Amino acid sequence: MRVFQIVYILIISNLIYATSGGGTSSHHHKNDNNIADNTNNNNNNNNNNNNNNITNATTTRTVTTSTKTKTHTGGGVAAMGGILGQNGWFYGDAGLMAAIFGAMLLL
């Protein structure tokens, strides 16, 4: 039963933390520029042909990459928002850990 209480506190703490404005989250898109140029040369397939039409087909693909950064600031959920939120008693990741360990000690 103790394990379930701890897991419950962890889940609830993370939910409160996520909605209270603490921390920073960001994600970066994969850079696809290394596949922007695909070249296909059909030079070796014309050995038995007597024509001089050697086709050089070049396909160029331009990929636009973007970087998005999302930052959560301010706000909070009821009383816990003031504790875990920005400029609260427990601010940032260290504040989240302090709140989690404190809740565990209370169980």
UniProtKB/Swiss-Prot annotation:
Residues 1-18 form the signal peptide. Cell surface GPI-anchored protein required for virulence. Mediates hyphal ramification which is important for the interaction with host cells. It is a lipid-anchor; GPI-anchor. Glycans are attached at residues 53, 56. It is found in: Cell membrane. Residues 33-56 have a biased composition (Low complexity). It comes from the Eukaryota. This is Virulence factor PGA16. Residues 26-56 are annotated as: Disordered. Keywords: Cell membrane, Glycoprotein, GPI-anchor, Lipoprotein, Membrane, Signal, Virulence. Residues 77-107 form a propeptide. The keyword Lipoprotein applies. The keyword Ribonucleoprotein does not apply. A lipid is attached at residue 76 (GPI-anchor amidated glycine). Disruption phenotype: Leads to strong defects in host cell damage in a model of human oral epithelial cells, increased survival of infected mice, and aberrant filamentous morphology. One of its GO terms (cellular component) is plasma membrane.
